[in-house]
Amino acid sequence: MHLHLRGICLVLAVASSSSSALAADAGHGADLAKRWCASCHVVANGQAVASADVPSFASVARRPDFSSEKLAFFLLDPHPKMPSFPLSRTEAGDIAAYIGSLRP
């Protein structure tokens, strides 16, 4: 019985994480990225100015280990060189979904 309950919990956890990734709004993420991220990163085709020492969003999306879920968690607590924006979980998920939409 305990193993059966454990299996059900695992299935529900996977399903809820998948549905939250599917619920992310890449269009809203693009808007947020252009507003908050474009001063450092190239966030869209045709963008002319960004910092040269940071990856473009397209290059992040092309990484073999790219994961929208991992990126969204990272955005909630970024590395020290990156400004700390007050992103909600939804906003972080939306930006990550936008970056994921840039995958070839």
UniProtKB/Swiss-Prot annotation:
One of its GO terms (biological process) is nitrogen fixation. Residues 1-23 form the signal peptide. Keywords: Electron transport, Heme, Iron, Metal-binding, Nitrogen fixation, Periplasm, Signal, Transport. Its main location: periplasm. One of its GO terms (molecular function) is metal ion binding. Gene3D superfamilies: Cytochrome c-like domain. It is found in: Periplasm. It comes from the Bacteria. Changing D25N: In strain: CC705 / UW505. GO terms for cellular component: periplasmic space. Changing G27E: In strain: CC705 / UW505. Heme c binds at C37, C40, H41, M82. It holds the Pfam family Cytochrome_CBB3. Belongs to the cytochrome c family. Monoheme monomer. Has the tendency to dimerize. This is Cytochrome c-552.
